[in-house]
Structures are given as structure tokens and as C-alpha cells.
């Protein structure tokens, strides 16, 4: 699963919109938007924030 699909999958599962996920992950909504639109590659630290916010391991997030 690519990053975009993972983000959308976990947003759906957790019933979060993009703004809610960004807040929960402690990141700017614009950064999350760029990642979702595949205009920016997330750093490992950003992946960790997203995975933590989605309550999964990074390996599950990028698998």
C-alpha cells in the first residue's frame, strides 16, 4: 500500500478528516495535504507521527 492509500485508509477507519489527522499527528494541514497529493515525500519522523496518530506501527503504515 502506498502512503496516500495508507493515509486515506486509516482516516476512513478512524473516521478522521484531513484536518483532524493533521492535528492528531502534530503537523500542518498543508504538509499532510502535500503528502496525500504525492507532491512531497514524508520523512521518517513524519511517517512516525502519522503512524502514531493512526495508532499503528510505521511498518503497518507503509506496508
Short names for language-model regions:
Residues 11, 22, 51:
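The alpha-helix within a helix-turn-helix
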Residues 15, 41-44:
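Residue at a beta-strand N-cap/secondary-structure junction
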Residues 16-34:
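Short alpha-helical DNA-recognition segment
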Residues 1-17:
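A short, Lys/Arg-rich alpha-helix, primarily the initiator
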Residues 45-60:
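DNA major-groove recognition helix of helix-turn-helix/homeodomain DNA-binding modules
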Residues 10, 44-45:
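Short, Lys/Arg-enriched C-terminal cap helix and immediately downstream tail that follows
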Residues 12, 26, 37-39, 63:
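Residue-level detection of the helix-turn-helix DNA-binding "recognition helix"
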